[in-house]
Amino acid sequence: MARIGYARTFTTDQNLAAQIAALRNAGCEVIREEQKSGASLEGRPQLMTILDFIHAGETFVITRIDRLARSLRDLQVIVDRLKAKGAHLVATEQPADTSTAAGKAFFDMLGVFAGFETNLRRERQAEGIAAARKRGIYKGRPPKIDRAEILLRLQQGQGPSKIARDLGISRGTVYQVRKGVFE
């Protein structure tokens, strides 16, 4: 089956040659290159092309995991997409190969740690919000609706659909304000 390589550097100043050579040595027939930040999956069209078109039994080859993803969450998203398609992931410089039992276990553990990281972040955020509320600093997100503006427009005879369209809210919200739900 096909082996598809992916080489990425953060900037155009960095050289992809070493990664490309390693991917060729790993038997990659196709190599996609990207010189962009790894901060966002969506901002990496070559990676998205590979994930969209890889087939069952094919292997996605990288040199190191940090070339693929900057966060456990993003890595888990990529691994899940590959798994759903029946494709494998191999890192040439690290013991990561999802076609083996050990490699599968490695990525399953990464998934556990990604969930743990998310839960820790939520806990820290909740603690920070609670502390800010105690100090009177945190007010939450400002409300999207301007109750007074809606009521004024209703009094002027505007219809709920026009008000909703103009203010970027749902018609239901206009009806709720009219009924007094948003006091």
Swiss-Prot record:
Q: Name one GO biological process term.
A: DNA integration
Tell me, what's a Pfam family for it?
Resolvase
Ordered alphabetically, the record's keywords are: DNA integration, DNA invertase, DNA recombination, DNA-binding, Plasmid, Transposable element, Transposition
According to UniProt, residues marked as the site described as Ancestral active site Ser are 10
- State a single Gene Ontology molecular function: DNA binding
Q: Where are the transmembrane segments?
A: none
Family annotation (SMART domains): Resolvase
- DNA-binding found in the keyword field: yes
Ranges of residues in domain Resolvase/invertase-type recombinase catalytic: 2-136
Q: What family is this?
A: Belongs to the site-specific recombinase resolvase family.
Q: Which PANTHER family match?
A: DNA-INVERTASE FROM LAMBDOID PROPHAGE, RESOLVASE HOMOLOG YNEB
The protein's name in its UniProt record = Integrase-like protein y4lS
User: What species was this sequence derived from?
Assistant: Sinorhizobium fredii (strain NBRC 101917 / NGR234)
